[in-house]
C-alpha cells in the first residue's frame, strides 16, 4: 500500500479540527485528543491508525474489482466527491440523497432508465416533433434526473461499500447501507457516532482541504490497486480556490 498520508499533511489540511464541544457525540470520545477554546481536537495518531485500516480495506476491494459509492451532499464536499469519484470511475451522489437509493434500488434504477430514454430523445430529431409545451416539460424532467442521478447511473448493482463525507448529514444513506449489510466508510467529525460506521476516518468533514486530502488519497489507492497510473488530482484546484477566498481571520468563506 504505497499511497500514504503523513501527520504533517493531516495537520496542514486541518484534519484535526473538530466541532464545538456542545455539538459533540460522546461516543466519539476515544478519538478526541483535547479541547481548546471550546473546540475538540481530534487525535491524529488515532486517525493514522484508522486510515491504515480503512485504506487496506479499500485497496483489497479495488483489487477485487469492487464498487464504492461515494456520497457527499454538503456544499463543500459536492465538487470534490464528483471529481474524485469520476477519477476513480466510481458512482457518486453529491446532490440530495433520494430515499431508497439502496433499499429500493430497483425503482431508482427505473428512474435511471427514464433518464437514458430522455437523453436519447433529446439527441434525436424526434424531440422537434413534440409540442413545445411537452418539450419544456420533458426538458425539466431531464434536468432534474440529471441533477440527482448523473453520478448514480454508473451503479448497475448494489455497491460493495459506500464512502460518505459526514455520516451525520448522510444519515439516511448510512442507515440504508447498514440495513443491507453494505460496509460504510466515512470521514467522520466529532459529532458522529462511530458505531454506525464500519471503517471510520476520524477527521474534519467540513473543511475543503481535509475532504480533498482524504478522498484524493483514497482514490489514488483505488487507481493504483487496479494497475492504473496515479496523476495529480484536479480537485486540488478547489483547495487553491478556497485559499484564495480566505478571510483575514484565516477561515475560508466556502468552509464557513
Curated annotation (Swiss-Prot):
The Swiss-Prot or TrEMBL record annotates one GO molecular function as: structural constituent of ribosome
Q: Which GO terms describe its biological process?
A: translation
Give the UniProt entry's GO cellular component terms: cytosolic small ribosomal subunit
What superkingdom does the record give?
Answer: Bacteria
Q: Which UniProt keyword terms apply here?
A: Coiled coil, Ribonucleoprotein, Ribosomal protein, RNA-binding, rRNA-binding
UniProt keyword GTP-binding, yes or no? no
Q: Which residues form a coiled coil?
A: 104-149
Q: Which InterPro entries match?
A: Ribosomal_uS2, Ribosomal_uS2_bac/mit/plastid, Ribosomal_uS2_CS, Ribosomal_uS2_flav_dom_sf
Is Phosphoprotein one of the keywords? no
Q: SUPFAM superfamilies annotated for this entry?
A: Ribosomal protein S2 (SSF52313)
Instruction: Note the HAMAP family from the entry.
Output: Ribosomal_uS2_B
Q: What does this protein do?
A: Spans the head-body hinge region of the 30S subunit. Is loosely associated with the 30S subunit.
Q: How does it assemble?
A: Part of the 30S ribosomal subunit. Contacts protein S8 and may contact the N-terminus of Era.
The entry's family comment says:
Belongs to the universal ribosomal protein uS2 family.
The protein depicted here goes by the name Small ribosomal subunit protein uS2
Q: Which organism is it from?
A: Thermus thermophilus (strain ATCC 27634 / DSM 579 / HB8)
Q: Which gene encodes it?
A: rpsB
